[in-house]
Curated annotation (Swiss-Prot):
NCBIfam families, sorted: PRK05170.1-5, PRK05170.2-5
InterPro entries, A to Z: Puta_zinc/iron-chelating_dom (IPR005358), UCP006173 (IPR008228)
Species of the source: Gluconacetobacter diazotrophicus (strain ATCC 49037 / DSM 5601 / CCUG 37298 / CIP 103539 / LMG 7603 / PAl5)
Superkingdom classification of source: Bacteria
PANTHER family cross-referenced by the UniProt entry: UPF0260 PROTEIN YCGN (PTHR37421:SF1)
Family indicated by similarity: Belongs to the UPF0260 family.
Record field: transmembrane: none
Name this protein carries in UniProt: UPF0260 protein GDI1595/Gdia_1801
């Protein structure tokens, strides 16, 4: 009996169902952080300021179904849109797969748990502030959202 490879290894982003596409989101929340664009160089500057709809504990949108109505500049990721988006974090599953890479061990589709993205230190949990409290974005420029994280390996729990 042969094991069937996971869908993200056998289908292109264009071929995925809506459910498969949505499941690629690891729930890190990095894409929901505000970004600035440097005028002269056009460089993306990441901040640690989260969209007001991002739940800073779960790192998920608190109103995903209505997000684009409530936050008009919220970007809807699609396979076609990926080519024009240069600000997705390097750890983002959509970006990784579009670049021909694979998902990391901490991705929920690989680990089988939605908690590994937090346990590995990949998510914005404990690192971001809501836009409601932040003040000027220029005061919150941060490098970490735009770098490939060096995840912490989970602790092995030994039976007592």
């Amino acid at each position: 009996m042969t094991d069937t490879p996971p869908f993200w290894q056998v289908r292109s982003l264009d071929e995925m169902t809506t459910e498969e596409w949505e499941s690629l989101c690891d729930g890190c929340g990095r894409c929901c952080l505000h970004k600035l664009r440097e005028d002269v160089t056009d460089q993306v500057l990441y901040t640690d300021v989260a969209c007001r709809l991002l739940d800073l504990e779960s790192c998920r949108c608190s109103d995903y179904a209505q997000r684009r109505r409530k936050v008009p500049d919220c970007v809807q990721l699609t396979p076609a849109a990926l080519a024009d988006i240069d600000w997705l974090p390097p750890s983002c599953a959509y970006r990784l797969l579009a670049e021909g890479q694979t998902l990391a061990w901490w991705h929920p589709l690989v680990s089988g748990s939605p908690d590994t993205v937090h346990e590995a230190g990949i998510s914005v949990r404990g690192r971001a502030v809501s836009e409601r409290r932040a003040g000027p974005l220029e005061h919150h420029i941060a490098d970490w959202p735009g770098t490939m994280p060096r995840p912490r390996r989970p602790r092995i729990r030994r039976p007592a």
